[in-house]
Regions:
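Glycine/serine-rich phosphate-binding loop and adjoining beta1-alpha1 elements at the start
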Residues: 1-23, 29, 60-189
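Conserved beta-strand elements of the Class I
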Residues: 33-35, 192
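Gly/Ser/Thr-rich loops at beta-strand to alpha-helix junctions
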Residues: 37-44, 64-68, 114-116, 198-199
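Glycine-rich phosphate/diphosphate-binding loop of Rossmann-like nucleotide-binding domains
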Residues: 41-55, 61, 172, 176-254
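Generic hydrophobic/aromatic pocket-lining and core-packing "Φ" positions
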Residues: 48, 73, 98, 203-204, ...
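A short helix->loop->beta-strand "cap" motif at the edges of active sites that frequently abuts
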Residues: 54-57, 81, 125-129, 148-150, ...
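ADP-ribose/adenylate-binding Rossmann-like module
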Residues: 62, 108-112, 125-138, 263-303
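Rossmann-like NAD(P)-binding element
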Residues: 102-110, 232-280
């Protein structure tokens, strides 16, 4: 555990009063076995710790191996949670984590992406789930093809989730991460935002606020029209890729930025995904290319010799 973890944890606890208040208002949770498939980063620690304090038994898996903070997982395990998750676990290990979570026989599920529910409905011998929670639009889309055998509360549609988290926080934190990782700003850069749902809207607005020259690509005619009415330059994805200095995907759909698109991008373009599904970008194609890490957490891929 790195030296400053306890300080960062204390900071997060202090500055998440609404989370603390919400957990404090819950009834006694003894007897509840909750399997959580979510981002296991610092901001989740106060929530999970509070649920443990209320008596819930908890099993932790991750919805995205690249966002796991191992120190957070270790701290929650010491508090009593069980977990099968670590940063950059491979595809086989990640898939196994879902099987382990369900073999633990949970009574309730809390998910970001519906991985556990999807896996459960592929097996006739899974645990008897009382109810579930789903936090993402991507997960809700997956559930539409599953026909769950138990009630699932869609908290992606809550006004506070839509209007605050999706519309504002995702875009802000995405660009903050970009600045901290690259040591660059968006000034004098043409930024292409792909997708104009709530996350895309917030990503575009934050990019403009931070100095970017923003273009929006959106295939849904109604959303594209909304983007025009909001004052954005709406562009065709295939032609705009070659013009962009920074490309941000925000759709929740797979393979939006394909190998063909990537081959059209200009030299030095930055590509990032702010949607839930990492495969919005054809990562498999990128990994097949020669690449190196010029900065921590920045991968450079060589398309042509």
């Amino acid at each position: 555990m790195y030296q400053d973890f306890e300080s960062e944890l204390s900071w997060a606890m202090r500055h998440m009063p609404r989370t603390r208040a919400a957990v404090a208002a819950l009834p006694d949770l003894h007897g509840v076995r909750l399997a959580c498939n979510m981002h296991l980063d610092l901001k989740m620690a106060p929530l999970v710790a509070g649920l443990l304090d209320k008596g819930a038994a908890i099993f932790l898996t991750t919805c995205n191996p690249t966002t796991v903070q191992n120190d957070v997982v270790a701290w929650l395990e010491r508090r009593g949670a069980q977990a099968y998750a670590w940063r950059d676990m491979n595809a086989g290990e990640w898939s196994e984590s879902f099987d382990r979570a369900l073999a633990w026989r949970p009574t309730h599920l809390c998910e970001m992406g519906a991985d556990l529910t999807t896996r459960l409905h592929q097996s006739p011998n899974g645990p008897q789930i009382v109810a579930g929670l789903e936090a993402t639009g991507s997960g809700i889309s997956r559930l539409n093809g599953v026909a769950p055998r138990y009630p699932i509360f869609n908290w992606d549609d809550l006004p506070v989730k839509e209007g605050l988290h999706n519309r504002h926080m995702v875009g802000l934190t995405a660009w903050h991460t970009f600045f901290q990782t690259t040591h660059l700003t968006l000034h004098e850069k043409r930024v292409l935002v792909i997708g104009y749902g709530l996350v895309g809207q917030g990503t575009a607005a934050a990019a403009r606020a931070y100095g970017g020259q923003v273009m929006v690509a959106e295939i849904d005619p109604a959303r594209a029209l909304q983007a025009r009415y909001d004052g954005w330059q709406v562009v065709d994805l295939a032609s705009a890729v070659a013009q962009a200095d920074v490309i941000a995907t925000a759709t929740g759909a797979k393979n939006v930025l394909s190998a063909q698109h990537l081959q059209q991008a200009q030299d030095g373009v930055f590509i990032l995904n702010v949607g839930h599904v990492a495969e919005e970008i054809d990562v498999g194609f990128l990994k097949s290319l020669p690449h190196h890490e010029p900065m921590p957490y920045v991968n450079a891929y060589q398309l042509n010799e």
